[in-house]
Design a protein with these regions (language model features):
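Conserved amphipathic alpha-helical segments that form helical-bundle/coiled-coil interaction surfaces
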Residues: 78, 82, 95-161, 174-182
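A short, amphipathic alpha-helical segment
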Residues: 14, 181-184
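Short linear motifs at protein or domain termini
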Residues: 1-91, 95, 101, 133, ...
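Active-site loop of classical SDR/Rossmann-like NAD(P)-dependent oxidoreductases
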Residues: 167-171
Length: 185
């Protein structure tokens, strides 16, 4: 299952891919990764195998590993599943959310709106995640949360692109308020 070094390397590589530090299509050589992350070849190989299973890296015969490109179709497929599961999560939250969680949801919606004014898209993406996290937690379904978190990670690197559009940002503020109202009532 990999030692502490390969697990630490794995999470660093995941983060670097998901935040776009390592770009889609970028070649990943063992030597460069060993040097960059100050580890030996074994943890690099283990991390590459796991990243391939997660769909973040593709192995190309006789060329090595590269950061996976995600097509618009991949993205739409993930979004389609996420929307369906998120609706289930919201339905569950309607009957299971506590007053404290409802207040937390309102604060998260307000925080998203406040963060919008700052113009920092990475922070805005995090504020959006925080809003949805409150719903996931209050739906009180561990398996559903795991799947939703996995889907969220798969599209993380596109979220910042998506948030560049002002119309999209305004739509999300409206959507957050509608979700809050639906759960409250």
């Amino acid at each position: 299952n990999g030692g502490p070094i390969s697990n630490s390397l794995l999470s660093k590589l995941q983060k670097d891919i998901l935040t776009g530090k390592l770009k889609a299509g970028q070649k990943l050589t063992e030597q460069e990764l060993c040097r960059e992350y100050e580890v030996s070849r074994t943890p690099v190989r283990e991390a590459m195998r796991k990243l391939e299973l997660e769909g973040l890296v593709v192995m190309i015969p006789r060329r090595g590993a590269q950061v996976a490109n995600i097509t618009e179709k991949d993205l739409n497929d993930v979004l389609e599943v996420r929307i369906a599961l998120e609706n289930l999560s919201i339905e569950n939250a309607c009957t299971r959310m506590t007053e404290e969680q409802l207040e937390e949801l309102w604060n998260a919606a307000k925080n998203f709106e406040a963060t919008m004014a700052e113009g920092n898209l990475v922070k805005l993406a995090e504020a959006d995640v925080a809003f949805h996290e409150v719903i996931y937690k209050s739906s009180d379904n561990r398996r559903l949360n795991q799947v939703l978190n996995n889907l969220r990670e798969q599209i993380y690197r596109y979220r910042v692109e998506y948030l560049k559009d002002e119309e999209t940002r305004n739509l999300l503020v409206k959507e957050h308020k509608e979700i809050y109202a639906a759960i409250k009532n």
